[in-house]
């Protein structure tokens, strides 16, 4: 996407087709992230309430870069449906890796800490793990606390239970 493609992106984000809206938002995200645009159109802001959680999440990510950090991050932290929490957290994790965006996330630390503590810890790729990952990225949690002791023990049990490699790597016997 380029600035010259903005009229096409505007049509795309207003489309009744979810695929068009999604890719239109992705185009806006690229331009916003690269500081090629700095105005947030109302149509894009309205997509924070899109029924498709992927579109809403990408729109939220985008509006943060367009000066609407409060609205965007609030949408990523608070899903419409609990089952979609990981979608928003995925975008929030990307934002937390950008040093320029970290201060915008900090007002939401209490929500993230609560999610990190209360959401399931042992499920693979669970939202609690994602919340803890965001806190690690922000420097609010030690990387050693990313996984709980039960998960660590479970991992050790799995590794100790594996069949030994024969022959060993780099051995000549």
Residues covered by each model-derived region:
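Structural detector for internal amphipathic alpha-helices that build alpha-solenoid repeat scaffolds
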Residues: 1, 11, 19-35, 54-68, ...
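Amphipathic alpha-helical scaffolding segments comprising HEAT/armadillo-like alpha-solenoid repeats
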Residues: 2-13, 34-48, 69-81, 101-117, ...
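Short coil turns that connect the paired helices of HEAT/ARM alpha-solenoid repeats
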Residues: 14-19, 48-54, 79-86, 114, ...
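Short, surface-exposed, charged/polar-biased interaction segments
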Residues: 26, 30, 61, 65, ...
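Eukaryotic protein-protein interaction scaffolds centered on beta-propeller repeats
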Residues: 143-157, 161-173
């Amino acid at each position: 996407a380029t600035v010259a493609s903005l009229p096409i992106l505007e049509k795309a984000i207003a489309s009744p087709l979810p695929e068009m809206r999604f890719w239109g938002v992705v185009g806006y995200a690229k331009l916003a992230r690269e500081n090629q645009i700095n105005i947030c159109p109302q149509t894009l802001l309205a997509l924070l309430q899109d029924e498709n959680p992927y579109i809403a999440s990408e729109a939220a990510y985008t509006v943060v870069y367009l000066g609407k950090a409060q609205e965007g991050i609030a949408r990523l932290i608070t899903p419409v449906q609990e089952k979609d929490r990981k979608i928003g957290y995925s975008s929030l994790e990307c934002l937390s890796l950008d040093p320029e965006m970290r201060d915008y996330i900090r007002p939401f630390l209490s929500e993230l800490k609560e999610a990190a503590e209360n959401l399931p810890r042992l499920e693979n790729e669970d939202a609690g793990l994602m919340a803890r990952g965001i806190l690690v990225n922000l420097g609010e949690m030690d990387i050693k606390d990313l996984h709980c002791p039960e998960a660590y023990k479970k991992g050790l049990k799995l590794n100790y239970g594996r069949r030994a490699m024969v022959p060993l790597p780099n051995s000549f016997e």
